[in-house]
Amino acid sequence: MSLVASFQNPVADAQYSFRRILKALSEPGVSVQLPAMPGFGALDSASACVLLTLIDQDTPLWLSASLNDEILRKNLRFHTGAVLTDDPSAVSFALADPALDSATLLAFPCGDEMSPELATSVIVQLENLTGGTPLRLRGPGIESSRMISPQLPDCVRDYLINRPHRFPLGLDFMFTCGEELIAVPRTTRVEVC
């Protein structure tokens, strides 16, 4: 097992990453570039940046089986103090891969009417942010509509289109591939083009 360096310039890179993540969340469907860095284990650069920027000892994290290896766990604990759990119903953040299933997705907390911000932010590391089913996004941060076509797991696409929780409840999604990030927060309406 070896520890991997985090950001090259920890303070500046974390601040820059935070601003880029905020841009992606406030402008759903806009692809943002995050700092290039080595991932941990099977993690790509963008997923590593998101975790290093947003995760700490107060944000329980669930990891999908294919990404959950010793290198990732030790690096997350060292760099972030992350509390890792196998219980999807007790997390603030989840890191998933395309094998994410519907039962796990629906087990993530979606907040409640008094505290919708307690919903899980789901980071899904994808093979590609293009070439999937074309989706039209509407809502806050989008002037009229925006099109995206990430190669989403079926359960995530179905969740986004059918939103099983009434507003303001729901999950926030961040899709990563390489050094790129696209976000679709729970306030965004999604339909197939």
Feature-to-residue mapping (PLM):
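Internal, well-folded beta-alpha domain core
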Residues: 71-183, 188-193
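N-terminal, charge-rich interaction modules
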Residues: 1-60, 64-67, 78, 178-180, ...
